[in-house]
Each structure stands twice: as C-alpha cells, then as structure tokens.
Curated annotation (Swiss-Prot):
Plays a role in embryonic development, including proper left-right asymmetry formation. Also required for proper cilia beating. Plays a role in microtubule (MT) stabilization and this stabilization involves the maintenance of NUMA1 at the spindle poles. Colocalizes with polyglutamylated MTs to promote MT stabilization and regulate bipolar spindle formation in mitosis. Binding of CCSAP to centrosomes and the spindle around centrosomes during mitosis inhibits MT depolymerization, thereby stabilizing the mitotic spindle. It comes from the Eukaryota. PANTHER family: CENTRIOLE, CILIA AND SPINDLE-ASSOCIATED PROTEIN, CENTRIOLE, CILIA AND SPINDLE-ASSOCIATED PROTEIN-RELATED. Pfam families: CCSAP (PF15748). The gene is ccsap. It is found in: Cytoplasm, Cytoskeleton, Microtubule organizing center, Centrosome, Centriole; Cytoplasm, Cytoskeleton, Spindle; Cytoplasm, Cytoskeleton; Cytoplasm, Cytoskeleton, Cilium basal body. This is Centriole, cilia and spindle-associated protein. Residues 54-65, 137-146 have a biased composition (Polar residues). Belongs to the CCSAP family. A motif (ST]-E-Y-X(3)-F motif 1) lies at residues 8-14.
Length: 263
C-alpha cells in the first residue's frame, strides 16, 4: 500500500528555487568571494602550487617567510671574527696550565719529609677505624634503646584506638516518631549527645492523640492513592470514547494537536 504524501499549504505555495533563475546570482557571489580572498591575502600571498611541492619533498608545511635565505656577507663575517678571537683564550689556558704544573713540582720537592713523619700516625688511625674495639657497655645501651623505642611505638598505636561506646538499650526500644507528651517528662540531656535525638518516652507511654494522628495520616494517604487511580481510569475512558471529528478546513494542524477546542 502506497501512502499518499500530504502536502501542506506552505509546501504548495513555496517551491524550491529553479536553477535558471538563480544561476547568475550564484556565480556573482562566487566571484565576489574569490576576489575578497585575494584582497585579504594581498599583504601575504599564499602560492598553493609551491606549497604542495614543498610538503611532498620535506613532509612539513612551513610558511615562505621562514625559508628566506640570509645574505652571505653576514655569514662570512662571523667566522672571521671568531677566528680572530679564539686563539687568545687558548694561549691563556696553556700558560695557566704550565704555571700550575711548576707550582706542583715545587710543592712535591718540599713535602716528602713531612709525609714520612705523618705516615705511621695515619696507619694507626686507619687500623683503629678498621678494627673498632668491642665495648660491652655500649652494646647493652643500644639494645635497651631499641627495646624502649618498640615499647613506645606499641603505646602510641594502642592510644590511637578509640574505645567503642556502649549501646544504650533504651534508645533502641524507643518509638520512631516524636511524641506529644515528650515535653512533659523531664530528661537529663546534659550528659547525652544532642544529635539524632529520640523521644524520651517509651512505647508504653504514648499519648492517645499521637496514635490518632498516626492513623489519620495513614487514612489520608490511602484516600489520595484511591483518587489518583480513579483519575487515571477516567482519563483512559475519555480517550477510548473520544469521537474523531470530520475534516474541518478551518482547523489548522496546531489547533488539531494542541488546542483545547478540539478536545
């Protein structure tokens, strides 16, 4: 079954523009856009053909301004200056190295007798460092220190653990909602934490007014639920019994879908 395409009044009146009528306008706009592009890029022209060949050879697209070659004069002048300047620091370094060597030779000629005298003392010191004397008192002190550290660490960890507060059995047995007669009973709230406070009275001491209020709320909830169900069923019946009206030429699509007149 082929469905017939419904055409609105707008679709009948306004059709797609024909190419014959708007071809010249389109070409004029295209020419204008190209001329504007040339004007905007006049300060820095971009040659598309050269750019493509460069990317094919090098693999990177770089603007032409960066590829400019500097004049050869500056390149020739720089190495000449460096050639003139470089030998001076090299000569200075050679003279300094020669002076340092002469000083070292003079010092070595004067030092040997002092080194011979100091040599045995150095050997004794090294021997002491290699074989330190075992002192029993120091060993016992070290052991005692390690034990005391362990004990202190155990004490610190124990102090961190907080003791669990004992549960209040009266609080568990209390009624879930605040009671009307709770204000009449004096309670010692100074010793208790005030957050999440439950009622002071037990379930045996609930006032009759509180129970009546509870039953009233439950009845109201049931009535509301019943009303919602009735409204839902009434809407379904209306939609079923709704008669589809005949075609009305004066009723627009908006009125048919969203207006209250059609309902």
């Amino acid at each position: 079954m082929v469905t017939k395409r419904i055409r609105s009044e707008y679709m009948k009146k306004f059709k797609d523009p024909k190419w014959d009528t708007y071809a010249k306008c389109y070409e004029d706009l295209l020419k204008y856009r190209l001329s504007r592009r040339l004007l905007e890029q006049a300060h820095k022209p971009w040659f598309w053909g050269e750019w493509g060949s460069e990317t094919a050879s090098s693999g990177k697209s770089t603007p032409l301004s960066r590829n400019k070659v500097e004049p050869l004069k500056t390149l020739d002048e720089k190495p000449e200056r460096s050639a003139c300047v470089t030998p001076e620091p090299a000569a200075e370094a050679e003279t300094q190295a020669a002076e340092v060597q002469d000083r070292e030779h003079a010092d070595t000629n004067l030092v040997p007798c002092d080194a011979e005298v100091a040599h045995p003392e150095g050997e004794e010191v090294r021997g002491k460092e290699r074989s330190p004397a075992v002192n029993p008192d120091s060993d016992t002190q070290i052991q005692n220190m390690s034990k005391s550290k362990r004990r202190s660490s155990h004490k610190y960890t124990r102090s961190k653990v907080k003791p669990q507060a004992p549960k209040d059995p009266d609080k568990e047995n209390r009624h879930p909602f605040a009671l009307y007669g709770a204000g009449e009973k004096q309670t010692d709230m100074a010793s208790k934490k005030t957050h999440n406070v439950g009622p002071a009275a037990s379930t045996a001491e609930i006032h009759e007014s509180a129970l009546r209020a509870k039953t009233r709320r439950e009845v109201e909830k049931q009535i509301k639920r019943f009303d919602k169900q009735r409204a839902r069923s009434a809407d379904l019946e209306k939609s079923r019994n709704k008669i589809i009206p005949d075609f009305n030429p004066w009723m627009t699509e908006y009125m048919r879908c969203f207006s209250a007149r059609s309902r």
